[in-house]
A protein has these predicted regions:
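Patatin-like phospholipase
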Residues: 1-61, 69-353
Length: 353
């Protein structure tokens, strides 16, 4: 498969002398993936003594793009946590900002989509050149246009970063997929289409079949997860020493990228199936998807490590998966997922500093 990205890379800005140049990757995962990621971010800050929002590059995909924008807008990890908990925020960019996590994106199920194929042109190209596209990109081309609205997400981002273009010097990068050409775009990079941050984040969150594609400068874009749930390989060539990857759709990785001790990815999935016995079509599909995401993530991180970048991975444990359930858009589980992630991520990061 050929990796295609519609822009050139840029080196990270120099950090303070003596400090490693760090990058942060926040993967997609819907409502519950965002809640898990907030818990993991808090654990990273506590364990490493490093403020994730201070990374030289913060790359977000889908729900991770929302959190990346919030961090780039100056929101602290403890404020993200308290906001998820429904506690009042009295200082900083989130002070007084209302966001209804229960209803913002329409609830646990999508509205009935429109009839028809979402991107006939992309589907035609993918059939002609299947090696050039991930399977999920090909599938997304067939999905009909969704009727869900991402405007509440856009309003949240505009409230934090304003309605204009990309802030000068911002570390924020947002991954999305061009819905006609099928290639990845990293908004915020030199050579990428110009976009307001809110537009870019909404584009990165536009799950085919759930939300309508988001138009930026006349072109339609969909969820960056249609290429990769993390897009961690996009951190190559940015002059970074180490990268933290938080991947809520992967399978229970430890900080250095292993599956849980002495177990490979396949063995971990078998144990998960034996213990939790996922039933129903959705549960089985999510299990298969997690396995595929984990394998792709490990391929991406091998590329980073081969280039000399230290990579630290975090993903849900068995305990997290049991709390999440199969529907990553179920708002009723959000609070429990956050608290579980705080516990399990702290344990996974014990002794990392």
């Amino acid at each position: 498969m050929t990796t295609r990205v519609a822009q050139t890379r840029t080196s990270a800005a120099p950090p303070a002398e003596g400090r490693p140049r760090r990058g942060l990757v926040l993967g997609g995962g819907g409502m519950l993936g965002a809640a898990w990621t907030v818990g993991a971010l808090c654990a990273v800050e506590e364990a490493v003594g490093w403020r994730p929002g201070g990374a030289e590059v913060v790359l977000g995909t889908s729900a991770g793009a929302i959190l990346a924008a919030m961090l780039a807008g100056g929101v602290r990890t403890d404020q993200l946590r308290d906001h998820q908990r429904g506690l009042p925020i009295t200082a900083g960019p989130l002070a007084g900002v209302a966001f209804d996590y229960e209803t913002a994106v329409g609830g646990a199920l999508p509205p009935r989509p429109r009839a028809g194929i979402g991107s006939p042109g992309l589907l035609r190209d993918a059939v002609r050149h299947p090696r050039e596209y991930p399977l999920l990109t090909m599938v997304s081309a067939m999905a009909p246009h969704g009727r869900g609205s991402l405007e509440p997400v856009g309003e949240l981002v505009r409230g934090l970063l304003g309605p204009g273009g990309w802030p000068d010097g911002s570390p924020l990068r947002v991954a999305a997929v061009d819905y006609r050409g099928g290639h990845r775009v990293v908004f915020g990079d030199p050579g990428a289409p110009s976009a307001a941050v809110a537009e870019a984040v909404m584009a990165s969150c536009a799950i085919p079949g759930w939300f309508a594609p988001v138009r930026v400068n006349g072109s339609a874009y969909v969820d960056g997860g249609c290429w990769s749930a993390t897009n961690a390989d996009l951190m190559l060539g940015r002059g970074l020493d180490e990268v933290y990857v938080l991947a809520p759709m992967a399978l229970r990785l430890h900080p250095r990228g292993r599956a849980e001790p002495a177990r490979g990815t396949v063995a971990a999935l078998r144990e998960w199936r034996a213990r939790d016995r996922p039933r129903g079509v959705l549960a089985q599909l999510v299990g298969r998807y997690r396995r595929a995401v984990t394998r792709q993530l490990l391929r991406e991180t091998r590329l980073l490590r081969a280039s000399g970048v230290r990579v630290h991975l975090l993903a849900p444990t068995l305990a997290d998966l049991a709390v999440m359930g199969p529907n990553m858009m179920d708002p009723a589980r959000r609070g429990a997922v956050l608290e579980s992630a705080l516990r399990t991520s702290r344990a996974a990061l014990d002794g990392v500093r």
